Amino acid sequence: MAGARRKLAFVLASSNHGTMIVNRLDYRMVNAESGYGVGFQILETASFDPAEVKLAVELLAARRRHHGDGVLALDCGANIGVHTIEWASAMTGWGSVLAIEAQERIYYALAGNIAINNCFNAMALHAAVSSEPGVMNIPNPNYMVPSSFGSLELRQRANNEFIGQAINYTENTAEIRKVALDEFNLPRVDFIKLDVEGMELEALEGADKTIKSSRPILLIEKIKTNAEQLHGWLAERGYVLREVGINLLAIHSDDKTLAELNPAKKAP
């Protein structure tokens, strides 16, 4: 029996990261030729932010050299799992990844990508990362409308980014779990990536104990967060900061990895 006609969003792509479930409509065009989005990059170039992925893998290897096996990386705002897959693959036999994604449909793709790439050292969690555990309501975008879904902000504010469609923060919302990283009581954390669309400071507050005890390397998207507050929070905890594209790389002053970095632009 023939099924109903329906538009397909998620497809399988043979990418440089492996076989990936990706939304072919995950893009926002800024002109006739240029656009952005995780899906856009993968389908146009076979890769997503390869330089950033390479840097993260190198930093994980450095943590292994200085702290031994058992490296743990947290991918907060994991999207469909490019970083998660690459990290888990690189750390086979000596490290693991906890990937956290708030958008339900994207979380399904993340979990599928972990499975299809046989990353038995990676785990996915459907939640938003914040300052305290609980629940929150987040918007439900239309995944059939071309948009940069990874740019979706979970909280409404005066200058929310236009991702390719209007977002309603009061109707058709979904209640999801909200986690603070400290609630996991992890004995060791080596690396935390925060790409949570303006909730980076909240996520840091919820990881304060973990950061103070483990002094992990932090890679934080900075374009939607107050720079002065972010720099101050990290500096108070002994971190040295470097600008890496749209991200802020923070390495504790006592971390031997700091001496291995090539000269880079220090954060002001």
List where the protein language model places each region.
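S-adenosyl-L-methionine
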Residues: M1-Q103, Y108-N113, N117, G164-T170, ...
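Catalytic metal-binding/acid-base residues of hydrolase active sites
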Residues: N79, Q103, S130, E197, ...
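Short, solvent-exposed polar/charged micro-motifs at secondary-structure junctions
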Residues: C76-A78, E132-N137, P187-R188, I251-D254
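Generic hydrophobic alpha-helical segments
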Residues: L55-L60, A180-L181, A207
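Conserved acidic-Pro-Pro-aromatic motif
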Residues: H17, V71, A88-A99, D182-P268
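Glycine-rich adenosyl-binding loop in Rossmann-like folds that engage adenosine-containing cofactors
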Residues: N23-V53, F120, L125-P187, L261-A264
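Short N-terminal helix/helix-N-cap motif within the alpha/beta-hydrolase-1
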Residues: V82-I85, Y108, G134, L201-E205
